[in-house]
Design a protein with these regions (language model features):
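Short, low-complexity N-terminal intrinsically disordered segments enriched in polar/charged residues
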Residues: 16-24
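Membrane-proximal, proline-rich intrinsically disordered regions
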Residues: 41-42
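Sec-dependent N-terminal signal peptides
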Residues: 4-13
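Short, contiguous alpha-helical
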Residues: 24-28, 32-35, 45-82, 120-160
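Acidic/histidine-rich alpha-helical segments that form the ligand environment
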Residues: 37, 87-120, 126-140
Length: 160
């Protein structure tokens, strides 16, 4: 009986889920919600800042995009690609969308070794799993800020 169990494991092992599957399965929703928030703000309000010490809305969206690239490049142990300097809503939304696409090409392909290895990130040297957690927290934190900017302008935040 034990040999059947071992045989079953040998046969099924190649079909086991990707080690990063637990992270990548939620990344689509994170991306869609964030892009929807960026798209919800009217172009003429991208310079809005709720407080003089706050980033304006466009800067906040660009900040999310920039750090997405930095976190995901760190997981590849490389520097981020050259990044644009968006000047309007369309450029900011594209920058954000492209950053999520970049990460979407990295995250599902991470190996168990990469998840357990230390990588450089905007939050310092972290294990790959911690880099992913920091990425998700960072996006959620700043997307939440962006939703407050929308509320200040009387705009309903996006919901999936």
């Amino acid at each position: 009986m034990l040999s059947r169990a071992v045989l079953a494991l040998v046969v099924l092992l190649p079909f086991s889920p990707n080690p990063a599957g637990e992270y990548s399965k939620h990344f689509g929703a994170l991306s869609k919600l964030s892009i929807a928030v960026a798209e919800a703000m009217p172009p003429d309000q991208y310079g809005f800042r709720p407080h003089t010490e706050s980033m304006n809305f466009g800067e906040l969206i660009a900040h999310i995009a920039t750090t997405n690239y930095q976190f995901c490049a760190g997981l590849k142990d490389s520097g981020p690609p050259s990044l644009p300097s968006p000047i309007d809503k369309d450029a900011d939304v594209k920058f954000l969308s492209d950053s999520f696409e970049y990460c979407s090409a990295v995250i599902p392909n991470l190996t168990e070794e990469q998840l357990n290895k230390t990588h450089n990130s905007p939050d310092g040297n972290l294990l790959g799993r911690e880099v992913l957690l920091a990425l998700y927290i960072h996006v959620a934190h700043h997307r939440g800020q962006a939703e407050i900017y929308l509320r200040d302008k009387g705009i309903k935040a996006a919901v999936l």
